[in-house]
C-alpha cells in the first residue's frame, strides 16, 4: 500500500478509474516498481526510469526516509519506500544488505565493465593513494599518472588520429566541456556566431545544465527550463519506431540525413558548431543506428564545416565488440567523450579527446585568447588515472573486445529468441548492449496503458529471480559486465525468459479485466 500511495500521488492528474485500477493492481501483485510518470504523458513515460521494488529489509536495517537526495528518484520514494541497498560485488554479481545475490545485467550504470571485484584495480588505487593521493593539473603542473593515461588513450584510439586529452570526472562533465571547448575553438578562429549544437531526440549526453540540454529526453528538460536555446534536436534514428511504410533502413537513413541538412540550412550553417551522437543510443532505449546512417550524417556535417562529437561514454572499451564504437561504425570524429568503463567505474573519471586540428588552434591562438580557463579540481586525479591506466591494460591484455565478440552472439540470440512474445514490440542491440521494448500488437503505435506498468512488472519479476535490469517506462535495458562467462549469459537468458513469461501472464490478466 505504501507503493500504491506514492503511485497515486504521482498520478494525481489521472482519472479516478485509472487510480482505482492502479490501486487494485498494486495490491494484487505487490511487484510493481513505482511508476512516477503522469499517465497522460506518454513521452515522459517512455523515457523515465523506474525505481526498484521495495527492499525486503526489515524496519531495523532498512533505510526508508534516508537523508540522501537521490538522483533520478522521485522525492516520495526516499520517504515512503525502502531502497534496494547494495553492499558488495563479486564479478558479474552484486549482493544487497540482506545477502541476496543479483546478476547485474546493467553493469551498475553501463560501467563496471570488468565486474565488481578486479584486484588489479584495487591494487592500483591503493598504491597511488599511498604514493600521491592528490595533486591538480592546473597552470602547467600535473602528475605522472595523468600524463601516462593521456598518452595511452591517444594510442588506443585508432578510428582517426587524435591530438590531446582533457580529463573530467564523468561523462556529463565531458560533454559539458565539449561545448565550452568548441566555443573557445570557434572564437579563436574568429567565428563568434558558430555556436549552436545539434543533438538527437532520445539521446542521452548527461544531466548537467548543458549536457542535459544536449540530451533528447523529455524528463531531463521538463521542470528544469531546458533545453538551452543554443541546442537543436534532430530525428532519432530508431528504424522500428519511425520508419515509413515500405521504407528500407538505407532509405530511412537517407531521409534522416536530408532532414538534418534541412535543419542546418534553416538555422544557417555559419551558426552550427557541432553535431553530437552516441554510436549506439543508450538511455534512450538502446538504439543501434540504421544501415548507412553515420556514413550519410558524417558527409552532411563535413559539408558544412560542422564538428562531429562521438559520445563514447557507454560504447568505449569493448562494449560493442570493438575497442570503441567509432570503430564499429566507421566514425571519424573531431572530438570524443568517454567515462564509465574508462576506470571500470571503480573511481570517477571521464575524458575528452580532441583532434590535432582543434588542439593546434588552441595552441596557436593562446597568445590572443589567453589560457583555456576551464577545468575541475579533480581533472586528471592521480588515483583515478592510475586505476584507468590499469583498466586499459586489462582491456588490452585480456583482449576484452574479442571476448565480447565471442560471448555476445549467444547473449543477443538468446534474448532475441523471445521476440515472438505477444507483449514484445522489439528487441534490439549489438555486442553486450540490448534493449527490449514492450508494445501491444508488436506495433510502436500500440503502447500498453501506462497504468499497467508492463516494464515495471518485468523488472520486478527479474529482481525477484535474482537479476537487476534497467526499466524506463516500457523499455528494458541490459548492458552486462564485459567479463561475463558463457554460464552467466545462460543464466541471464533463463531469468529473462522466466520473467517474460510471468509478465505475459500478468498482461493477459490485465487485458481480461479491461475487457470485462
Swiss-Prot record:
GO cellular component: mitochondrion
N6-(pyridoxal phosphate)lysine modifications at: 340
Stored SUPFAM superfamilies: PLP-dependent transferases
EC nos: 2.6.1.96
Top EC class of this enzyme: transferase
Keywords: Aminotransferase, Mitochondrion, Pyridoxal phosphate, Transferase, Transit peptide
Residues binding pyridoxal 5'-phosphate, per UniProt: 171-172, 311
Database matches in Gene3D superfamilies: Aspartate Aminotransferase, domain 1, Type I PLP-dependent aspartate aminotransferase-like (Major domain)
Domain of life of the source: Eukaryota
Subcellular localization, as worded in the UniProt entry: Mitochondrion
Ranges of compositional bias, category Polar residues: 45-60
GO BP term, pick one: gamma-aminobutyric acid metabolic process
Transit peptide stretch: 1-47
Catalytic activities: 4-aminobutanoate + pyruvate = succinate semialdehyde + L-alanine; 4-aminobutanoate + glyoxylate = succinate semialdehyde + glycine
Entry GO MF terms: 4-aminobutyrate:pyruvate transaminase activity; adenosylmethionine-8-amino-7-oxononanoate transaminase activity; pyridoxal phosphate binding
CDD domains referenced in this protein's UniProt entry, alphabetically: OAT_like (cd00610)
Binding site residues for substrate: 204, 340
Region entry Disordered, spans: 45-64
Summary of the function given for this chain in its UniProt record: Transaminase that degrades gamma-amino butyric acid (GABA) and uses pyruvate as amino-group acceptor, but not 2-oxoglutarate.
Recorded family membership: Belongs to the class-III pyridoxal-phosphate-dependent aminotransferase family.
Protein known as: Gamma-aminobutyrate transaminase 1, mitochondrial
Organism: Oryza sativa subsp. indica
Amino acid at each position: 500500500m505504501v507503493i500504491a500511495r506514492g503511485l497515486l500521488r504521482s498520478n494525481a492528474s489521472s482519472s479516478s478509474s485509472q487510480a482505482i485500477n492502479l490501486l487494485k493492481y498494486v495490491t494484487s501483485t505487490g511487484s510493481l516498481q513505482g511508476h512516477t510518470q503522469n499517465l497522460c504523458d506518454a513521452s515522459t513515460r517512455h523515457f523515465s526510469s523506474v525505481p526498484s521494488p521495495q527492499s525486503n529489509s526489515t524496519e531495523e536495517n532498512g533505510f526508508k526516509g534516508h537523508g540522501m537526495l537521490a538522483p533520478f528518484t522521485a522525492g516520495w520514494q526516499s520517504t515512503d519506500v525502502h531502497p534496494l541497498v547494495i553492499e558488495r560485488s563479486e564479478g558479474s554479481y552484486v549482493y544487497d544488505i540482506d545477502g541476496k545475490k543479483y546478476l547485474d545485467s546493467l553493469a551498475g550504470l553501463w560501467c563496471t565493465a570488468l565486474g565488481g571485484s578486479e584486484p588489479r584495480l584495487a591494487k592500483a588505487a591503493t598504491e597511488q593513494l599511498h604514493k600521491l593521493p592528490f595533486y591538480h593539473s592546473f597552470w602547467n603542473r600535473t602528475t605522472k599518472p595523468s600524463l601516462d593515461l593521456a598518452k595511452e588513450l591517444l594510442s588506443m584510439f585508432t578510428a582517426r588520429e587524435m591530438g590531446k586529452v582533457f580529463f573530467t570526472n564523468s561523462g556529463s562533465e565531458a560533454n559539458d566541456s565539449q561545448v565550452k571547448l568548441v566555443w573557445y575553438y570557434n572564437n579563436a578562429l574568429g567565428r563568434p556566431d558558430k555556436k549552436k549544437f545539434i543533438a538527437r531526440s532520445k539521446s542521452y549526453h548527461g544531466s548537467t545544465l548543458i549536457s542535459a540540454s544536449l540530451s533528447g529526453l523529455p524528463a531531463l528538460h521538463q521542470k528544469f527550463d531546458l533545453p538551452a536555446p543554443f541546442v537543436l534536436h534532430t530525428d532519432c534514428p530508431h528504424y522500428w519506431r519511425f520508419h515509413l511504410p515500405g521504407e528500407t533502413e538505407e532509405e530511412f537513413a537517407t531521409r534522416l540525413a536530408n532532414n538534418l541538412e534541412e535543419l542546418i540550412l534553416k538555422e544557417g550553417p555559419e551558426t552550427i558548431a557541432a553535431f553530437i551522437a552516441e554510436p549506439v543510443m543508450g538511455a534512450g532505449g538502446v538504439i543501434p543506428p540504421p544501415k548507412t546512417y553515420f556514413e550519410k550524417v558524417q558527409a552532411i556535417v563535413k559539408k558544412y564545416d560542422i564538428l562531429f562529437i562521438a559520445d563514447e561514454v557507454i560504447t568505449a572499451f569493448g562494449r560493442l565488440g570493438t575497442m570503441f564504437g567509432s570503430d564499429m561504425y566507421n566514425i571519424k570524429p573531431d572530438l570524443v567523450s568517454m567515462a564509465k568503463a574508462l576506470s571500470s567505474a571503480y573511481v570517477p573519471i571521464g575524458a575528452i579527446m580532441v583532434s590535432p586540428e582543434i588542439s593546434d588552434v588552441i595552441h596557436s591562438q593562446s597568445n590572443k585568447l589567453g589560457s583555456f580557463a576551464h577545468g575541475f579540481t579533480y581533472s586528471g586525479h592521480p588515483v583515478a588515472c592510475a586505476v584507468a591506466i590499469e583498466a586499459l591494460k586489462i582491456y588490452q591484455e585480456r583482449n576484452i573486445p574479442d571476448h565480447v565478440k565471442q560471448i555476445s552472439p549467444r547473449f543477443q540470440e538468446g534474448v532475441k529468441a523471445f521476440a515472438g512474445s505477444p507483449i514484445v514490440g522489439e528487441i534490439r542491440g549489438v555486442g553486450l548492449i540490448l534493449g527490449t521494448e514492450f508494445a501491444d500488437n508488436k506495433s510502436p503505435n500500440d503502447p500498453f496503458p501506462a497504468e499497467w506498468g508492463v516494464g515495471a512488472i518485468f523488472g520486478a519479476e527479474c529482481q525477484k529471480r535474482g537479476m537487476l535490469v534497467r526499466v524506463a517506462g516500457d523499455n528494458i535495458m541490459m548492458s552486462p559486465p564485459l567479463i561475463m562467462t558463457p554460464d552467466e549469459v545462460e543464466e541471464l537468458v533463463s531469468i529473462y525468459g522466466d520473467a517474460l513469461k510471468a509478465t505475459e501472464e500478468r498482461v493477459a490478466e490485465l487485458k481480461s479485466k479491461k475487457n470485462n
